[in-house]
Amino acid sequence: MAANKKILKALKSTITHLENSIHALNRKDENSLAESIWHVAAELEYTLFLFSVTFQDEIDKSKWKLNPKLKKLEVGSTLVTAQDLLNEAEKYMSNKKLLDAYKNAYIARHYILKVQKDFAKKKREALKKK
């Protein structure tokens, strides 16, 4: 049971950082946004690590469908999608549906990594222009 509490605590921390990211986006504060996204990714990785320790090799994540059409999504809509997935994961945790929570967190990670990748690309392009 202690593992479930740790997972839920990490998941809540991830959601809090994601909310901070959305607020930074609304304020058009790119530095805070990038920093908050980094914290989201770090907390989400920790959450997924805790899930993986709980489940070990019991599941086949390759069956979890990720959205392949993430080429040109806006940052805001991508963050909202990740937020919805993480809020749903939190509800699953409350209902003791750990596998469903794990799946949603795993898919949310895909969206967060997409945002990070886009930020890195913009930063590289800005450096090339200088």
Which residues does each PLM region occupy?
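Long, charged/polar, soluble alpha-helical segments
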Residues: M1-K130
